[in-house]
């Protein structure tokens, strides 16, 4: 699946009423191994910054995808944990660089949010949908760099 197709899929999930985290996680079932339903169930509380304005559900879902692609387990010990930490910090850094915030409450207050190139190509204007599509595009770029896609 191309990055654009994955972004389109996440956007369609969001348009159908899924929250931001559900929309992102369900677009990566081929990487996580979760079914659509499992993805939706797992991320059902991610929307609205875990329903309290905290960390954006897009980020939470992307962290789950990274964890499934590059897990930290008892088997891989401290090295797995170190890699997991580095990947999460790298994704957060990229998100912060683009949107200047990590928390839903602050992201929703921003009036000059500009999406990534695919978000612009798809004509996304809905605030949270911009986060969904842009987050998927950023994660795909990161996974491609890591050769997981």
Annotate each PLM feature:
Residues 16-22:
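Short acidic alpha-helix initiation/capping motifs at coil-to-helix transition points
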Residues 61-69:
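DPxDG-like acidic metal-binding loop motif
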Residues 84-149:
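C-terminal binding/interaction regions
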Residues 45-53:
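Transmembrane alpha-helix interface/packing and boundary motifs in multi-pass membrane proteins
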Residues 31-41, 68-87:
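Phosphate-handling active-site elements
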Residues 1-14:
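Polybasic, low-complexity association/targeting segments
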Residues 20, 56, 104:
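Short cysteine clusters
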Residues 1, 25-44, 105-111:
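Acidic-glycine-rich active-site phosphate/pyrophosphate-binding loop
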